[in-house]
Amino acid sequence: SDIRLKAYRFSISWPRIFPNGKGKFNKKGVDFYSKLLDELLKKNIKPFITLYHWDLPQKIQNSGGWSNREITKYFTDYSYLIAKKFGDRCKNFITLNEPAVFSTFGYLDGYMAPGLKNKKKYLSCIHNINLAHGFAFKSIKSVSSNIKVGCTLNMAPSLAFSNSNKDINAKITYDTFWNRAYADPMYLGSYPKIIEDKIQNLIKENDMKIINQKNDFIGLNHYQHIRVISDKKNLLGARSVNLKELSKKININKNLTTMNWEIVPDAYYCQIMELKNRYNNPNIHLTENGCSFSDKVNNNGKILDVKRINFLKKYLKAVHKAIKNGAKIKSYFVWSF
């Protein structure tokens, strides 16, 4: 409240509420978040709850995690409980944070938990995650129609690394799986054909109706655009470029954050406008944007955070430009590193 924040987005830990993923809930876990909500409201700070930000109960992971369709039932029960306990005080719920990240890096590339490189399980994840969102949406709305519900997606314009046909085709594939595997079914009611052809056997009757709810908003996380290169070793045949490859294209000393992410404000504007134009001009919450830079305390005991200030200025100008061009931006949340 001292820095006049109007809203605070936080994640609830599923294992903290249901240590086994299901069954009896943990009252101490519920009480912790209840106290947090009460304190936020005392300070007139609007809470935004994210139900899943990658911490999965181990017993559910032992049964296949997101690759097992049964997870949709457990996530629905968890979502319902949170809505019952907190829906009187929190009116903005985000079901899932960055499905493309935890599915791709967890089940296809093996960078994140559970560390798998399994294309079949990855494809199952896509459909199960979409279903989980749809079921959770319905369960939350059954508690109160006044609760606003959406999903936060990590999206970015994709660029082919070169003009070769291989890289151009790789870019199309990567862009489809990264940017549209979740947004299209959730907000348009259908999968892109390249994905539908691969998961048709997983889609049961009424699945698409469950997935395609009347979402109240889209949450957008954005940090950089993506340069895509063809790679036969990757299970999709496409991947984002590494730092060595990137250095051949740009001056990495001037155009990267300390996490080696490109600084391209125009990409932010383009992604916001893509949401506006492709998904029928939805309400958009900009749920994450920010940068990582080294902080140094000077002789006066201050941090002259010039790079971060300049980054935020440029990206907020991109947001303002999108608003002037009709995008319905409802909030902007800085992600601090």
Label for each model-derived stretch:
Residues S1-Y33:
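Active-site-adjacent substrate/metal-binding segments within catalytic domains
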Residues N20, V30, S34-F337:
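Active-site region of glycoside hydrolase catalytic domains
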